[in-house]
Amino acid sequence: MSTSSMKSQDSNGLRERINNGSATNDDNMTARCGSEPPSEDFELDKDKKTFGRTPDGTIFTVPQTHDMVSQLLDPRQPKNLSDLIVLVILALHIFALYALPSSLKRPVFAVIFLFWRGCYNVGIGYLLHIQSHHKRIVAWAKKWNLFENPVTGKNPRPWLYQLIKTELETKIPEDYKFEQAPIEYNTWLVFRRVVDLILMCDFTSYCLFAIACGGAPSDEGLVMSTLRWGAGIILVLFNLWVKLDAHRVVKDYAWYWGDFFYLIDQELTFDGVFEMAPHPMYSVGYAGYYGISMMAASYSVLAISIVAHMAQFAFLLVVENPHIDKTYNPPPPRKHQDNPTPSDIDHANALASSKEGLEYSLDSSPTQTPPLNTTQPLAVHNLMGLGNIDLFRITDVSILLLLGYVFLITALTPSTPVYQALFVINAMFWRLWYSVGLGIILDRQSSKKMWTRHFVKYGDSTEEAWRQWKGMYHLSMTMCYASFIAATWKMYSIPSDWAYGLVLLRHVLGAGLVSLQLWTAISIYESLGEFGWFFGDFFFDHAPKLTYSGIYRYLNNPERIIGLAGIWGAVFITGSRAIFCLALLSHTLTLAFLQFVEKPHMQKLYGRNLRSEAGLSKSIKRSLPPQIKKWHGNVDRVLEETGHFVEEFLDAARPKLAAGVSTIFRDTSALFSQYPARLTLTRIAPDLAGYDPRDYSVTIEGTSSDSALHKRTTSKEGITARIPQERMDGFKPLVFEYGAPIKVKWTAPTKHSKADWIGMYMVADNASREVTRIPSAGRWVATVPNEYESSPADQGILVSNRFVSGSKRIDGSTQDYVEGEMIFEGDKLFWTQGVFEFRYHHDGKHNVMAISLPFEIRIPRFDDENSNVNITLDSDNSQSQSLIRSAVEQALLPVVRNCFDRDPDIAPNSVDESFGVLVARDGKYPRRVVHAVHFMFGIEFAPEVVRADGNVRNLAWRICNAKQVLAPYSMSHSKGTNTPDVDGEKA
């Protein structure tokens, strides 16, 4: 079931976008809807009814439906054939439990449950994935004419039409007419019947498997049995409440993933269980599985419950989350210039369409260095994550070396009491330094900017202080947890009998708690980013107000409880008193850090803007009786008074502590001052007879790159090859700009297959000119729309099957034909240099009917020859720098626009206009830009640089600055020597 209600805060933007997009099609919309109610009646009815909107803008009334349990088991609800089929299948499951021998019940029902769980997570997941990305399920319904009235003669299966019509109208007696409902809604109704079967069989087979495995330990007492059954029943009841409350909030629309098919035109609610936990139906909504495992007292049931839960999380990450982000969390519109001049836009479009040459106006005043963001550091070279490890960075190398030492010492030393004590003491030291030492530094930074002042005193910038702090914090955190893991390993001994007592259960619980802490840490980092993770608001100006997103939507301080679940998991796994004391110390110090370091700083920055209660706290307090609420308020007062007392005590002792810390820093500073193969199936059409390749043709048009064409001959060739080539015909080689859209025009006989398609390939990738042997990798467009189930196949079609009569062939005969046009842009292009061609293929197969002329995509190198000013990038003259920077900006702007697909939402129209937000979200755009910059200027940047610079002017400034810095080490052609001539100086 979909958890789209969690994105309700973005639903207004969604409706505004849909309304704006459909405002120009009101007449067509009204015609499709049959009779849309007048505006006044529409507003009155809207309070009572729910209205849906299909992707093409059709508005319809969404009738009321009921959940699957009520439909199947409530005798008051109408029944039909599909209900009978589901009930019969469920009855067969129950019958099998009693019919099978005892030795076969467990394995058979384990296989049955895993089958239905696979149908759920893999089967339904696949269907939803292709529906979200390609509208494939609706396309199947259209292709098979499932909902086409047999009266039209287009439905080859009228019996199936009548069956589906009877099934759906029986279930929905009000506000629903099968013939008038949109195809998306009818398809969703059929889809949910399949979902009903899978979900009911999934849960039933799980319960039957638990019954087959159920039992009681032979040595279990009455008290333990009562506790086990009581806890299990509580978890099952809690699970039931979560499901019922979730269904109350999201209704059948989100329960059956309705937003994969259509959208409802109303406010999405956000309350109840959705304030308690993220994705409650997939997280806390599976508590009942563990309750049933406890009642069954079976590790087999627990194991299969964990497998099912993990599969459900995989379903969430792979299927639902991408769809939710795409549907309810679109990128915000790009910030355009306040007063963009028409000349800016015209100039940008002219540069993007054709580049005949560059002209630069001489300005006596040097161009100012573009101001970079100084309020917060640029997130370019992050520390966190395996993907950000950089062996050229001293912090990463130091951490890897220290981790290597910890691993070697842990592995090579015996687990004697002496070594165990040393490892525990080492872990205790790192925890004290991580919580107390860094806490004191942050407290001094918050009140007196101590850390920043130290670096400014020696001439460094605030960003240098920030980098050094991040390195220290990252190293301290890594060593804190590495030393704790090492101590845990030393105190751990592999059990000799896993079935003894609660040994296996302790390991399962411990592993679960460790996983919970890892998930919490990832969620915190995703919510806060690098800046928040390293307490950036202690060092830089803070935001005007706090935003609570991600895990902070439900908890104010996740680190307080679940953020330390892993250390208590280690206690369960080891069963060691020393690890218990270490975990207790860690938890206490973390709570103290939050209370005495982070909380005062946040109150000083944000004051009353701080949220008093999180979503989980609100949900729990609402469910408490009044007496407990009153007692809770008294406890809060006592804790607050105790906190004030401790703060006063620390204020009195702070001067002595500060003096001691200063001494440690001074002594430490003095000490350190001394010291792939892929299988491809090629489909060949058997019906090529009667199709003449001479009747097909493919021609192309694109944005020519004349500067790249003129640079084919350089001084690197022999003397004869340096002479300009004299052509014997009027042919001009096709050289196009990097990333510029390419228009393809094709002709074909009138009887050509509607499934024909055109793909883009590298010339060197295909040895055969008759059959294409490699896949197109998505770089293809159909010649006729709506012939393929994949919607990207139609993206790019401009003209299709336009009839042309009387074409004269080479043999003198005339013949009618059809023609079409399509455009290849964005992901349908190769984002690299090379020689390419377009191939026209027959009938959805790989038989080639026509091939375009080969064309080249090149990135022209920026040097003195493509600039009208006689200067170099490494010039020291200020006026020269101004001129060359302007030249770089103008050369870079059309390339950046091409790299951003010339999308008006993200591509800039001028050098000062900021990039769209999607550039920061989708890494392909920055990677395209840095690839082009590398070939244009010989400078290699990381993609994060493009995100951080934010516009063409900043990027051009960075390129010029990098060229100046790297000039002495450049090996490119230059007008002078790059290094001084020592002998010449001596002479």
Curated annotation (Swiss-Prot):
Pfam families: PEMT. Keywords: Endoplasmic reticulum, Lipid biosynthesis, Lipid metabolism, Membrane, Methyltransferase, Phospholipid biosynthesis, Phospholipid metabolism, S-adenosyl-L-methionine, Transferase, Transmembrane, Transmembrane helix. Residues 1-12, 19-28 have a biased composition (Polar residues). Residues 105-107, 215-221, 293-298, 415-421, 505-507, 582-987 are cytoplasmic. It is found in: Endoplasmic reticulum membrane. It catalyses: a 1,2-diacyl-sn-glycero-3-phosphoethanolamine + S-adenosyl-L-methionine = a 1,2-diacyl-sn-glycero-3-phospho-N-methylethanolamine + S-adenosyl-L-homocysteine + H(+). Residues 1-83, 129-193, 243-271, 320-393, 443-483, 529-560 are lumenal. InterPro entries: Phopholipid_MeTrfase (IPR007318), Phosphatid-EA_MeTrfase_fun (IPR016219). Its EC number is 2.1.1.17. It is a multi-pass membrane protein. The chain crosses the membrane at residues 84-104, 108-128, 194-214, 222-242, 272-292, 299-319, 394-414, 422-442, 484-504, 508-528, 561-581. GO terms for biological process: methylation; phosphatidylcholine biosynthetic process. One of its GO terms (molecular function) is phosphatidylethanolamine N-methyltransferase activity. Catalyzes the first step of the methylation pathway of phosphatidylcholine biosynthesis, the SAM-dependent methylation of phosphatidylethanolamine (PE) to phosphatidylmonomethylethanolamine (PMME). Belongs to the class VI-like SAM-binding methyltransferase superfamily. CHO2 family. HAMAP family: PEMT. This is Phosphatidylethanolamine N-methyltransferase.
